[in-house]
Amino acid sequence: MPLFIIALDGHLGLFYGFLLAFIGAYVIVAGVSFMFLYLVRPASVAHLKIQQQMPSRKEVLHEIGWSSLTLLVWAVMAVILIYFIDRGLTQMYSGIESLGVTYFVFSILFLVISHDAYFYWVHRLMHDSDFAYKYIHSIHHESKNPTPFAIFSFGPIEAVLMGLYVYLIVFLVPINIYALAALFVFDTTANLFGHMGYELIPKKVTKSRIGRMFNTSVIHDLHHSGQQYNYSLYFRFWDKFMKTANQDNEKVWEEFHARNEK
């Protein structure tokens, strides 16, 4: 019998709970952002749209539909994870005081850095392989002009790959549930900025010494419009180290800000 059926048996309440929580987070984060940036669209931010044309209704519905399927997949994966935790098969622990606050804080930093590395290599492999791109990753790239609704717009296999990182970590490293929650919040926020279609972070921030370490909306938007290079998620390190940064990053970024400073 498939593991997900065994895990769901007697845990349907948990499944629906996770599903509602994921949907709620998606509606609040993506829905509210879309409403503000694409429906209300105040003059104070309208000029910050990276691609001047607006996405079609078909593109938006595509993003919502596939994101909904991703949330369903993740709810099933969350229940399976609970199944493993209940049987003591993971290194998940409760109570921050168990291993101390210092460990808890550093575990969050570890999650962010290791997840960034995991995402880069999985993402790059899905582009380097024509087969993987066509059958796994191409759904996400149908968003040529992404909106906030694209943050979880994956096919089912890619949704599993994106969620698989959590499984790998909790079997290897002691992790508190609140540290995972912090990663989810950080990841969702980073994804939102990468796919919102607007560059809202001021130039003086993104051009600062610290700001240059992080991805920007313009950089990831270039990835969606060109499909090559700029594979990183949070930080720009992997693209720079592996020489997969788009050579036009700085040029396009400067042109964008020059256009908006007139």
Describe the role of every protein-language-model region.
Residues V32-L61, I85-I96:
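Membrane-helix interface linkers and caps
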Residues A21-R41, W74-A78, L111-V122, A190:
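Hydrophobic alpha-helical membrane-embedded segments
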Residues M1-A25, L39-P42, H47-R57, S129-S138, ...:
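Cytosolic/stromal cytosol-facing helical appendages immediately following the last transmembrane segment
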Residues L71-T90, L161-V173:
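Alpha-helical transmembrane segments and their membrane-interface junctions
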Residues L14, K49-L71, G95-V105:
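Interfacial transmembrane-helix boundary/kink motif in multi-pass membrane proteins
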